Curated annotation (Swiss-Prot):
UniProt protein name: Probable deoxyhypusine synthase
Residue positions of the active site: 284 (nucleophile)
E.C. number(s) listed in UniProt: 2.5.1.46
Function summary: Catalyzes the NAD-dependent oxidative cleavage of spermidine and the subsequent transfer of the butylamine moiety of spermidine to the epsilon-amino group of a specific lysine residue of the eIF-5A precursor protein to form the intermediate deoxyhypusine residue.
One term of GO molecular function: deoxyhypusine synthase activity
Gene name for this UniProt entry: dys
HAMAP family referenced in this protein's UniProt entry, alphabetically: DHS
Organism: Thermoplasma volcanium (strain ATCC 51530 / DSM 4299 / JCM 9571 / NBRC 15438 / GSS1)
Length: 310
């Protein structure tokens, strides 16, 4: 260690007034010293390069955040074509469709779930999802489109099916619609794990020649990976969305840029808790990559991190 180099950047106090913008604040985070704020600045710097360079940018996230107002921010990112590929879960399709045509409500973590069940309200953290805004609504919208798409052809790649259903939504508030309109593919490797997937199963029960070609999705992903000069990923939360993103990037020796936002810890060996450092050993992140792990609630972190780019 070089003492002079280590002591080259003094900690500076924040200066905030009525004229301070998020961009100003982010710039001040570069000299704040501790703790998560410094990581936010590092993430901002990485994402800036990710967006500026000839880079294929992945965005991965779980479904729960789409039940919140963070859906609007994700939608704006998609509208501005800041990312090239989305990898997510079946529940994202559910919540995006449901909130396009119905309403979710602000609630509390502390409500009685037994009582909520009795009055047909589902609780997702502190978000309330009434029955009429979810199951039957999604069934109606998806089944209507499946009938139309089935009349065109019997076999569909999931990524194509999602695009066609997205276009049919024709509503600017919808992530699916704007992704389809802007040719940003949405990959859902666990497509059957949600209401959208249940509609696919139900439709198959009535039409046994209806087929979902998941391997075609993987073929499309392989083309994206092998054609990319560089790749970067903004990963919100873990699970299948994060893993599918880093899994495919191992076939090009790993991501060049990565930002991972999580609340999970690594002590239990879980994928969600695994730091990006661990992914280097699996060749899913390059040893010389620029990356950062940020611990915190995505509904707080993402608006602060992404607002300067919008």
């Amino acid at each position: 260690m070089d003492r002079k180099e280590l002591l080259s950047k003094p900690v500076q106090d924040l200066r905030i007034d009525g004229n301070t913008t998020l961009s100003n604040l982010m710039a001040q985070f570069s000299n704040i010293g501790g703790f998560t704020a410094a990581k936010l600045y590092e993430a901002h710097s990485i994402i800036s390069d990710m967006f500026l360079e000839d880079n294929t940018t992945f965005l991965s996230f779980p479904a729960d955040i789409i039940s919140t107002g963070l859906r609007g921010l994700i939608n704006d990112v998609v509208k501005r074509k800041l990312v090239d590929v989305i990898i997510t879960t079946s529940g994202t399709l559910d919540h995006d469709i449901a909130r396009t045509f119905g309403k979710y409500y602000c609630g509390s973590f502390n409500y009685s779930d037994v009582e909520l069940r009795e009055i047909n309200i589902n609780r997702l953290g502190n978000v309330l999802v009434p029955d009429e805004s979810y199951g039957e609504l999604i069934e109606e919208k998806v089944m209507e489109q499946l009938e139309k798409l089935y009349s065109i052809k019997k076999e569909w790649a999931t990524v194509d099916l999602i695009k066609e259903i997205g276009l049919s939504i024709n509503n600017e508030s919808s992530i699916l619609y704007n992704a389809a309109k802007n040719d940003i593919p949405i990959f859902v490797p666990g497509i059957t794990d949600g209401s959208f997937g249940s509609q696919l199963w139900s439709f198959y029960e009535q039409h046994h020649d209806f087929k979902i070609n998941l391997l075609e999705d993987e073929h499309r992903l392989s083309d994206i990976i092998f054609d990319a000069k560089k790749t970067g990923a903004i990963m919100v939360g873990g699970g299948i969305s994060k893993h599918h993103t880093i899994w495919w990037n191992q076939f090009r020796d790993g991501l060049d840029y990565a930002v991972y936002i999580t609340t999970a810890q690594e002590y239990d060996g879980s994928l969600s808790g695994a730091k990006l450092e661990e992914a280097i050993s699996w060749k899913k992140v390059r040893p010389n990559a620029r990356f950062v792990n940020i611990y915190g609630d995505a509904t707080v972190i993402m608006p602060i991190l992404m607002a300067p780019f919008l």
